[in-house]
């Protein structure tokens, strides 16, 4: 496949911090790097809005339906712009070196079942929010989790 016909990733993604009323945060382990993270993923097309991307990625990666009446998806109105790791830059158009990431929180009931996408993730765990922040590979992911007390209903 030549560069002209190749479909590149869109450098706009979401980060979704999934948490319970007791402020346990879901982390999932990546297949390719073995690192722990929250749900992340890029827009499928340029006109997909941030919330659509968040709902789709959560369902694809965890099997959790963010639109379920017992779940509460919240756009935290935060964006991170960062350099794309060199190991992943091949996924993007040659002139692209930075990604913009929109941060969401998703409140789910205690005991929400998790069904991973085995091609993307190998394991999952619920951790206290501070421990989850310490366990993340990505600095922007850790920073988002540390903001949970600011955005979670009732604080943390």
Enumerate the predicted regions with their spans.
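A short coil-to-beta-strand element that immediately follows conserved catalytic motifs
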Residues: 65-78
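Active-site-adjacent beta-strand/loop module that shapes the phosphate/pyrophosphate-binding cleft
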Residues: 77-113
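NUDIX/MutT-family hydrolases
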Residues: 102-108, 113-146
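Generic C-terminal helix-cap and adjacent flexible tail
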Residues: 150-156
């Amino acid at each position: 496949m030549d560069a002209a016909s190749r479909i590149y990733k869109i450098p706009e993604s979401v980060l979704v911090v999934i948490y319970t009323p007791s402020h346990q945060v879901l982390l999932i382990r990546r297949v390719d790097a073995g690192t722990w993270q929250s749900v992340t993923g890029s827009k499928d097309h340029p006109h997909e809005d941030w919330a659509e991307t968040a709902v789709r990625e959560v369902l694809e990666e965890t099997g959790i339906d963010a639109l379920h009446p017992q779940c509460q998806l919240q756009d935290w109105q935060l964006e991170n712009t960062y350099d794309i790791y060199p190991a992943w830059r091949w996924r993007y158009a040659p002139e692209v070196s930075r990604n913009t990431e929109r941060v969401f929180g998703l409140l789910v009931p205690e005991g929400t079942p998790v069904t991973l996408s085995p091609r993307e993730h190998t394991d999952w765990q619920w951790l206290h929010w501070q421990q989850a922040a310490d366990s993340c590979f990505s600095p922007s992911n850790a920073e988002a989790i540390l903001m949970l007390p600011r955005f979670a209903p009732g604080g943390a």
